[in-house]
Amino acid sequence: KEKESRLQLFDVLDESAFRKAPRLLHKYPGRVLFTASHCAMHCRYCFRRDFPYEKGRVEYEEELSYIQKDSSIQEVILSGGDPLSLSDPVLANLLSSLDRITHLKRLRFHTRFPIGIPERICSSFLDILTKSRLKIWFVVHINHLVELDQEVEEALNHILALKIPILTQT
């Protein structure tokens, strides 16, 4: 009850009505928002900064079951928290599970990690992306041009080298 009332207090987007599983929102046709369990950064514009995340949770049966049962869902948006706060083994398992859902076509990562922790875009993570049959997109959250240094550029270039489009959100 306390968790629910806390969520209602800080639910500025009125998302509670669209929650289909603990980490899954289905607000718009054809896509779902799959939220990560936590984030490594605190963004001042974050809508979910007070969200009652379940740290350490790496099983997503309810979320995957909901996606599997609704064939109108073609896109999964991995957001936050931040999906890159999950370990490579957890992400690999999640992407593998999503790959097996035949009606899915796209996977979108919304992340700030390439900006704040560019070394997260490492070879093991990139290898996970290459194994997916889904069309992957990245939406990178950038506050200001001064954040775009050489390390960030290299991280983004690693993603682009895989022919993965990158959009920005500020």
Model region roles, listed by residue range:
Residues 61, 68-71, 75, 84-170:
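Conserved AdoMet/S-adenosylmethionine-binding subsite of the radical SAM
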